[in-house]
Amino acid sequence: KRALQSEKRRQHNASRRSMTRTYLKKVIAAIASGDKAAATAAFAVAQPIMDRMATKGLIHKNKAARHKSRLS
């Protein structure tokens, strides 16, 4: 039972981590394109997701803070 739970949790966490990285890539792509409005909008969407992942323990809170600081 524990092995099944662990595998299910691992897949769920991998999905969440991938989603987080995707949102970060969208922000970076918007910044690289030079579109300030799109970059601001993408950052506004990505910021609460980073906070949520840090709260749930998927990424360290300092890592979330570092990403937000570098992107803002």
Curated annotation (Swiss-Prot):
Q: Name one GO molecular function term.
A: small ribosomal subunit rRNA binding
Please give the GO cellular component terms listed in this UniProt entry: cytosol; small ribosomal subunit
InterPro entries (alphabetical): Ribosomal_bS20, Ribosomal_bS20_sf
Q: Which UniProt keywords apply?
A: Ribonucleoprotein, Ribosomal protein, RNA-binding, rRNA-binding
| UniProt KW Ribonucleoprotein keyword | yes
Q: Name one Pfam family in it.
A: Ribosomal_S20p
What domain of life does the UniProt record list for this protein's source? Bacteria
This protein's record includes keyword rRNA-binding: yes
Q: Which GO terms of type biological process are on file? A: translation
Instruction: Write the signal peptide boundaries.
Output: none
What NCBIfam families has UniProt attached to this entry?
Answer: S20
Spell out the family assignment given in the record's similarity comment: Belongs to the bacterial ribosomal protein bS20 family.
Explain the purpose of this protein. Binds directly to 16S ribosomal RNA.
Query: What name does UniProt use for this protein?
Result: Small ribosomal subunit protein bS20
Taxonomic source organism: Aeromonas hydrophila
